[in-house]
Amino acid sequence: MPHQQILMLFGLLPVATNISTWWNFGSMLLACLTLQLLTGFFLAVHYTANINLAFSSIIHITRDVPYGWMMQNLHAIGASMFFICIYIHIARGLYYGSYLNKETWLSGTTLLIMLMATAFFGYVLPWGQMSFWAATVITNLLTAIPYLGSTMTTWLWGGFAINDPTLTRFFALHFILPFGIISLSSLHILLLHEEGSSNPLGTNSDIDKIPFHPYQTYKDMLMLTIMTIMLLTIVSFFPDIFNDPDNFSKANPLVTPQHIKPEWYFLFAYGILRSIPNKLGGALALTMSIMMLLTLPFTHTSKLRSMMFRPFMQLTFWTFTATFLVISWTATKPVEPPFTTISQVAALMYFLFFISNPIMGWLENKIMKL
């Protein structure tokens, strides 16, 4: 029977005995992706990619389409769940040295970039006030590119300002990118199982492994159940918790919101962008805030893989986590003292983590030799 063969495949998949709950977020991300694809399809059926009708079509979905409110809220809050899971997934990779599995890490970072692009395009689609102005601010960064900037911006906008062609192509990109994410996710999983998962100790797991089914399948199901309960609780009782009040008004190019800010999951990158008082410098810092993840497999100098036995690196990691939260917080505040100073210091500390990583490894190796 085909389903028995699938179970056999999972049953024969060897997994380290000591992997913790932090290793469950990969399967949760797969569940989030499936949810986003299904709800996204049903929303696309009723959505109209036109600047005069987009906002009204969202209202139509939530009011008139049977269970449209649920689809819309599941899709919007599901995106937040997706990013919560992916940030925990990346933090796990950083802490336990999973980035030393180079191919898996590099494909995962590419997935993150694609996911962020997809989420950005999706945020523009309701054509609310904050959607419009966030799109204006972020796409305007392309003009900072020397020589090509203005041409690229005009090409992306489909004119000399954000208008109907921009919304149409953003909808097309938001629809097509998830298929790229599916393909790359498959590659990511394939590359992971070439070498196998790491473990909290950062040691070779070959000497002590158990079958994936039933042990890990039940563990995955528990975490998926918890995530589903959380998601449905927010959808049912606090559906607007992540929404911006400005986005309940239709886009008006003549009125600028008092404070333009993206969704919460982009705040760290937006905070880094704002901390540099130069357009090109800010755009480069924004790009580097993600691209720095690509350097980790090549700058690891410690003899130990995991941070479990590296107290100095643990301190650095938790400082980095706090920095991430501080940048996100300052990005929600207006551009005035003391927030500008705090965000500049936090942005500097954010990048210092990637610089201190090889130095800490070298220092620990020296201490171990004493």
UniProtKB/Swiss-Prot annotation:
Necessary cofactors: heme b
One cellular component term from this protein's GO annotations in UniProt: mitochondrial inner membrane
Binding-site residues for heme b b566, renumbered to this chain: H89, H188
Binding site for a ubiquinone: H193
Annotated localization: Mitochondrion inner membrane
Membrane topology: Multi-pass membrane protein
Keywords: Electron transport, Heme, Iron, Membrane, Metal-binding, Mitochondrion, Mitochondrion inner membrane, Respiratory chain, Transmembrane, Transmembrane helix, Transport, Ubiquinone
Other observations noted: Heme 1 (or BL or b562) is low-potential and absorbs at about 562 nm, and heme 2 (or BH or b566) is high-potential and absorbs at about 566 nm.
Protein name per the record: Cytochrome b
Gene: MT-CYB
